[in-house]
Amino acid sequence: MTGIFCIFMWYLLLILYMGQIKGVFGTYEPITYKTGCSLWGIFFIISGISIIRATWYPSQRQLTCAMLENILCMILAIISMILTIVELSTFKSVSYRNYGQAKLGRQISRVLLSFYPLEVSMALTYSIFGCVGLCRKKEDARTADTEEVEDAF
């Protein structure tokens, strides 16, 4: 859900910044918009899909894939958080016509900044439970092997 929200917010920023008029001071193009940080929500959607697949068809490969995607999502969310903080801490003056759009864009960045820790915590939680699931699978496999050996004797 947070991935879809981030993508919609990026689309809103796209519409907002595409409508800027070149003024004396130029247009406001923040670093998060140029890098498409909110568009990285696609990785969160893919990660969620892999988690659902891992719960429906549990295997070591599915759990490992879901865990690796969650780790990637954590890294991307932390990078997005850092870029957003850098964007909000620096502000160049823009022309009077674009000031309202720049101000609204900064408010959207603040909203997204509040969602990045949520994304990190969700990905961390799923990664922890993925590790627990992988360890449990390995223990179950070892237990099954020892039971087969004991039954043979």
From Swiss-Prot:
Transmembrane residue ranges: 1-21, 36-56, 71-91, 111-131
Membrane association type: Multi-pass membrane protein
Coiled-coil parts of chain: none
Keyword Membrane on entry: yes
Keyword set, alphabetical order: Membrane, Receptor, Transmembrane, Transmembrane helix
Intracellular or extracellular location(s): Membrane
Superkingdom as given in the UniProt entry: Eukaryota
GO biological process annotation, one example: cell surface receptor signaling pathway
Entry keyword annotation includes Ion transport: no
Cellular component GO terms, alphabetical: plasma membrane
Protein family per UniProt: Belongs to the MS4A family.
Function (record text): May be involved in signal transduction as a component of a multimeric receptor complex.
Protein name according to UniProt: Membrane-spanning 4-domains subfamily A member 13
Naturally occurring in which organism (per UniProt): Bos taurus
Upper lineage: Eukaryota, Metazoa, Chordata, Craniata, Vertebrata
